[in-house]
C-alpha cells in the first residue's frame, strides 16, 4: 500500500458555482460599454444557414473574449461553456460550431473585419496622440505541414507566413496588421498600408515613421516626403555608405579606434537626390576587435532621414527606440496567440490573425483608458495574473447576480477602482 503524508484528507472539483476568472468582468464590461458587438454586426459572412441558433457576431465575439482571456486551444471552448461566470450573460456554442464558423469566412469578411480593427485604433490615436510615431516591422508566423500560402523564409530559415505590422509607438496600437504569404518580401505592401493609414490619421506634418533596413526603398522615401512624414530608416550595409562614413570621420579628424560600442562616434553627411532635394545620412561608428586585434575598418551603423534638426546622436537614439515596438509584436504573438495559425486555408488563418490583432488593440485601449500608473505598461500576461485570475463565487437569487470574490485577493482596492472607472464610461 502506498503511504501518503497529505496535508488534506480529500480533494474534489465539486465546489459549485466557482470561477477562476473573476477579473474577466473588467474587460467584459468594457467591451459592452464600447458597443463592440454592434460594430461586429456589419461584418459579412457567406452564411446559408436558416434560423441559426448562434449568429456569426455572437461566435466571433466569443472568440475575441477567449483570446483576451488567454484561452487559445480549441478545447478551451469547453471552459466558456462550463464556467459559471463566463457563460452567465450569453449562450456559449460548442467547438464544432466554432469550426463551422470559419467555413463561412471569405476575403470580404477579413477585409471588413480589418477596417473595424484599424478604425478603432485611428479613433483612439486621433483623439489621444498629438505626435504619432509609426513603427513598421515584418515578423514570422511558423507553419506546419501543408498550409496554404506558406513558404520557406530565408531570413528566418523556416516555413511560415510573413506578416507586416505597423504600430503607433505611444499607444502601442496596431494601425496595420497584414498577414502576408510566406513568399512576400519584408516591405511588400508597406506603401499600400500607409495609404490607408494616412487617409484616416490627422496629419499636420507631425507624423514620424521608423523602419529597419527592409524598408530602405527610394519609392518609400519619396512617398513619405510627399505626405509630409519625417522618416528614420536603417540603411543597408552598402560599401558606399561605409566608405562615405569613414571619409567623414577622416575629414573631422576622428580616430575610430578611440570609440567603442558603448561610446561610439556620431556623424552625418548628406546625399543629393536632385538639384533641390537632399537626404541626410546619420551614422555611428566604433572599432571592432577580433582575436584581440583591432580591425582596420570600423563598424558603421547608418540611418537615412529627412530630419535635419536633430543632432546625429538624437536622431540615432530616436531610431533605436523602435526596438520597443518589436516587443509589441512579441506581445501580439505570445500573449494573444498571433504566432500560432493552425488552419489549412489562408483566409481562415488571416481571420485568426485579425482576431488576435483586435484583442491586442482592445486590451491596449482598455489599458490606456482604465489602468493607471505602472499598470499602463504591463503586458497582457501580467495583467491576467494580476487582475483576471481571481477566485469568485457566482450567486444567483431573485433575478439578481452577486459575485463574491476571494477575500484574500491582494489587489482588491485597485480592482474596485478600475471597476468603477469602467462603469462610468
Predicted regions located by residue number:
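Short, surface-exposed basic-aromatic patches at helix termini and helix-loop junctions that form
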Residues: 202, 221-230
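Structural motif
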Residues: 18, 49-58, 294, 343-353
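Short, glycine-/Ser/Thr-/acidic-enriched flexible segments
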Residues: 139-141, 171, 180-182, 238, ...
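An anionic, glycine-rich sequence signature occurring as long contiguous blocks
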Residues: 2-7, 230-334, 414, 420-425
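Acidic/histidine-rich, metal-coordinating catalytic segments
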Residues: 137, 206-215
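Basic, amphipathic alpha-helical segments enriched in Lys/Arg and hydrophobic/aromatic residues
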Residues: 339-400
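Short amphipathic alpha-helical "interface-anchor" segments enriched in bulky aromatics
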Residues: 30, 77, 140, 312-351, ...
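Dynamic "connector" segments at or just before major functional cores
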Residues: 1-200, 224, 367, 390-425
Amino acid at each position: 500500500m502506498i503511504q501518503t503524508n497529505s496535508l488534506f484528507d480529500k480533494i474534489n472539483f465539486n465546489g459549485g458555482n466557482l470561477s477562476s476568472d473573476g477579473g474577466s468582468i473588467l474587460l467584459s464590461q468594457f467591451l459592452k460599454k464600447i458597443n463592440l458587438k454592434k460594430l461586429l454586426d456589419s461584418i459579412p459572412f457567406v452564411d446559408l444557414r436558416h434560423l441559426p441558433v448562434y449568429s456569426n457576431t455572437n461566435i466571433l465575439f466569443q472568440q475575441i473574449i477567449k483570446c483576451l482571456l488567454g484561452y487559445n486551444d480549441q478545447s478551451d471552448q469547453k471552459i466558456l461553456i462550463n464556467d459559471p461566470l463566463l457563460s452567465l450573460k450569453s449562450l456559449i456554442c460548442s467547438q464544432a460550431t466554432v469550426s463551422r464558423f470559419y467555413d463561412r469566412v471569405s476575403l470580404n469578411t477579413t477585409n471588413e473585419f480589418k477596417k473595424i480593427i484599424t478604425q478603432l485604433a485611428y479613433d483612439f490615436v486621433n483623439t489621444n496622440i498629438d505626435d504619432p510615431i509609426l513603427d513598421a516591422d515584418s515578423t514570422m508566423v511558423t507553419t506546419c505541414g501543408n498550409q496554404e500560402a506558406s513558404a520557406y523564409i530565408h531570413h528566418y530559415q523556416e516555413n511560415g507566413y510573413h506578416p507586416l505590422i505597423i504600430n503607433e509607438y505611444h499607444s502601442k496600437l496596431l494601425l496595420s496588421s497584414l498577414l502576408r504569404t510566406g513568399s512576400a518580401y519584408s516591405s511588400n505592401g508597406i506603401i499600400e498600408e500607409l495609404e490607408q493609414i494616412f487617409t484616416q490619421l490627422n496629419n499636420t506634418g507631425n507624423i514620424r515613421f521608423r523602419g529597419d533596413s527592409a524598408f530602405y526603398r527610394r519609392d518609400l522615401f519619396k512617398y513619405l516626403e510627399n505626405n509630409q512624414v519625417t522618416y528614420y530608416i536603417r540603411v543597408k550595409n552598402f560599401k558606399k555608405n561605409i566608405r562615405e562614413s569613414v571619409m567623414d570621420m577622416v575629414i573631422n579628424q576622428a580616430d575610430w579606434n578611440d570609440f567603442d560600442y558603448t561610446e561610439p562616434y556620431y556623424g552625418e553627411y548628406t546625399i543629393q537626390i536632385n538639384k533641390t532635394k537632399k537626404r541626410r545620412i546619420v551614422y555611428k561608428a566604433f572599432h571592432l576587435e577580433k582575436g584581440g586585434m583591432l580591425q582596420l575598418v570600423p563598424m558603421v551603423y547608418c540611418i537615412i532621414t529627412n530630419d535635419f534638426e536633430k543632432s546625429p546622436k538624437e536622431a540615432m537614439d530616436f531610431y533605436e527606440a523602435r526596438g520597443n515596438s518589436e516587443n509589441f509584436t512579441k506581445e501580439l504573438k505570445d500573449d494573444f496567440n498571433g504566432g500560432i495559425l493552425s488552419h489549412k486555408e489562408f483566409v481562415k488563418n488571416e481571420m485568426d490573425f485579425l482576431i488576435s490583432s483586435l484583442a491586442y488593440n482592445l486590451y491596449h485601449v482598455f489599458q490606456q483608458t482604465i489602468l493607471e500608473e505602472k499598470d499602463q505598461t504591463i503586458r497582457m500576461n501580467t495583467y491576467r495574473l494580476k487582475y483576471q485570475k481571481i477566485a469568485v463565487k457566482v450567486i444567483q437569487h431573485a433575478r439578481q447576480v452577486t459575485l463574491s470574490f476571494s477575500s484574500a485577493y491582494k489587489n482588491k482596492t485597485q480592482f474596485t477602482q478600475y471597476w468603477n472607472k469602467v462603469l462610468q464610461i
